[in-house]
């Protein structure tokens, strides 16, 4: 988009000079000087406690009238988004890049997720009073800058006209842990946002962070010490270790049910099938749909593309080795502009938003955008598949079954998870096949059970959230569980579709732990699969892989039943897990089908 935008700055005109005497026409092309937005550096925005935040403000060249103001509120240093600011300043908006408290050139100290709500309120109201603003203020951004929009909204600044949160992180859901399981990435992110500078090179050094994660993993160290292992001891990291569940510490950072009920402004939520913050984005969306007024919900639109985290702002045709059609690459700058025009300038609603939910279907050579009035109305059939086996389901060659009729018999499937084993993690570090990889399934080392459907008789659209219900018994009081679903193409190639995780002690509630009673058969419901939309090809099969994760990418559970972040190899207990699927214990996978 940048290249197109630069070309667009030059206006080429042809001047016709008519000579009456010679009747000759001469064409001349004169390139006009590029129209560059005006910029104000080091603008100081006062907060209620006296701290001053730093902003860089971009305005349309020689701005002639007050306009709506867009701002990005970021810990990643405002300069990172200069290209966006230039774009919107060229399209009729004032744009402010604002460093959050304690980052960049802003005063104060940065503590993630703590100050942005009230600070953001003050930013909105200060911008609204500036002579270049017409009283309407909005926000742009994703990830942390998506979270910012929701936390500012819960303060209800009078001049906030709309928000467009993309890939919005949700404290207590997908950050700093995901469903109560931490990972080394949180320390990488804390290093990225340490001090006042960008730290982009260090943050992006995959070799360094991979080596540190592997060191923690191979040496069986306590996760609570990972910040020291990584070289950046962090008080925030330690505070998070003391808050391992979604409690009041995280609740105060996000809207409450009462807050959702008072929302009135238009909202456009953006996420992707492979967005790491998809759980957060959907948590905000679903809670607004649950608690919001009917009028407000009519003004909340949702876009779900075949995108990863970065793709929710700059879509690409390829993600993790999968390639998508040209239509998947939306011009999100253009869409944002149209949305802002509609919400703040009285323009037309973006033509792309034909209904309140837009999602992109991939697969089976028939990709396209589709629409629905609500998230729930996308699918019109639930297909229930029953897990079964002859007692052997530990490999892709001797797997269990997923069938629409429950298989006869009462065989069980068993696997073993030894937290002292490091072969899976060591192999994972060399795996660069992304969403097409089968390494973890093919080399599960006896840790997991695998089930396949029969080949699909016709191409079938599966869109939405899967639900897995399984009955397990184990000989440890806690372990971690993961369920992954793949499409296995007729060629034998694999495509990752969705996954879900669970720490066994939180099987009944994410807020309260209940250790497992060893030897007792209990129900485990995985209802936190990520959203996806795929047309499964004729001849393809679905594969379900249930196992205990053993990876450098997550905090390791040593199965002792103690505080997981404090466990080391000395606490390790091998887990023997049994999956039961008989008439009294129906283990099922539910698929949302679109017909």
Predicted regions mapped to residue ranges:
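Short beta-strand/loop motif that positions the catalytic acidic residue
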Residues: 269-271
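Cap/lid segment of the alpha/beta-hydrolase catalytic domain
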Residues: 60-129, 313-324, 445, 477, ...
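N-terminal cap/lid segment of alpha/beta-hydrolase-fold proteins
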Residues: 29-63, 456-457
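Active-site-adjacent alpha-helix of alpha/beta-hydrolase-fold enzymes
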Residues: 279-300
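Accessory cap/linker subdomain of secreted extracellular hydrolases
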Residues: 90, 154-262
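Glycine/threonine-rich phosphate-binding loop and adjacent beta-strand/alpha-helix elements that clamp
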Residues: 30, 296, 325, 331-332, ...
């Amino acid at each position: 988009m940048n290249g197109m935008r630069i070309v667009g700055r030059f206006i080429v005109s042809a001047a016709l000079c008519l000579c009456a005497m010679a009747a000759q026409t001469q064409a001349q092309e004169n390139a006009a000087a590029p129209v560059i937005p005006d910029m104000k550096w080091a603008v100081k925005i006062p907060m209620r406690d006296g701290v001053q935040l730093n902003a860089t403000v971009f305005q349309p060249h020689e701005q002639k009238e007050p306009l709506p103001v867009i701002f990005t509120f970021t810990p990643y240093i405002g300069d990172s988004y200069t290209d966006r600011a230039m774009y919107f300043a060229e399209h009729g908006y004032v744009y402010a890049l604002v460093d959050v408290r304690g980052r960049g050139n802003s005063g104060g100290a940065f503590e993630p997720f703590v100050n942005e709500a009230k600070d953001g309120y003050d930013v909105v109201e200060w911008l609204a009073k500036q002579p270049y603003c017409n009283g309407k203020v909005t926000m742009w951004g994703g990830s942390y800058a998506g979270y910012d929009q929701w936390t500012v909204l819960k303060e209800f600044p009078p001049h906030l006209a709309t928000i467009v949160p993309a890939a919005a992180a949700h404290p207590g859901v997908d950050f700093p842990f995901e469903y109560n399981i931490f990972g080394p990435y949180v320390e990488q992110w804390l290093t990225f946002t340490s001090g006042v500078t960008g730290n982009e090179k260090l943050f992006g050094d995959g070799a360094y962070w991979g080596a540190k994660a592997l060191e923690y993993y191979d040496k069986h160290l306590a996760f609570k010490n990972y910040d020291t292992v990584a070289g950046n001891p962090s008080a925030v990291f330690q505070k998070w270790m003391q808050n391992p569940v979604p409690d009041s510490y995280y609740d105060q950072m996000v809207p409450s049910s009462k807050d959702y009920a008072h929302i009135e402004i238009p909202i456009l939520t953006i996420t992707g099938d492979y967005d790491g913050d998809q759980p957060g984005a959907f948590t905000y969306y679903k809670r607004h749909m649950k608690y919001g007024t009917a009028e407000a919900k009519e003004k909340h639109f949702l876009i779900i593309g075949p995108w990863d985290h970065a793709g929710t702002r700059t879509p690409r045709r390829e993600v993790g080795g999968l390639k998508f059609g040209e239509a998947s690459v939306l011009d999100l700058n253009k869409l944002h502009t149209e949305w802002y025009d509609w919400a703040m300038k009285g323009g037309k609603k973006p033509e792309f938003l034909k209904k309140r939910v837009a999602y992109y279907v991939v697969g089976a050579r028939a990709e396209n955008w589709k629409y629905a009035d609500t998230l729930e109305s996308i699918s019109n059939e639930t297909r229930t598949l029953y897990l079964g086996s002859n007692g052997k389901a530990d490999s892709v060659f001797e797997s269990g079954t997923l069938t629409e009729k429950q298989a006869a018999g009462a065989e069980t499937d068993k696997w073993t998870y030894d937290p002292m084993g490091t072969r899976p993690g060591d192999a994972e570090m060399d795996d660069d096949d992304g969403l097409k990889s089968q390494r973890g399934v093919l080399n599960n080392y006896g840790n997991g059970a695998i089930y396949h459907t029969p080949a699909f008789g016709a191409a079938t659209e599966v869109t939405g959230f899967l639900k897995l219900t399984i009955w397990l018994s184990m000989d440890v009081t806690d372990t971690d569980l993961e369920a992954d679903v793949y499409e296995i193409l007729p060629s034998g190639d694999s495509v990752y579709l969705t996954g879900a995780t669970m720490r066994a002690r939180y099987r009944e509630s994410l807020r309260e732990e209940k250790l497992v009673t060893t030897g007792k058969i209990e129900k485990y419901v995985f209802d936190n699969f990520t959203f996806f939309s795929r047309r499964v090809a004729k001849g393809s099969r679905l594969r379900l892989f249930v196992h205990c994760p053993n990876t450098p990418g997550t905090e390791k559970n040593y199965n002792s039943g103690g505080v997981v972040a404090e466990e080391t190899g000395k606490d390790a207990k091998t887990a023997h897990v049994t999956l039961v699927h008989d008439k009294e214990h129906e283990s099922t996978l539910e698929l949302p089908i679109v017909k």
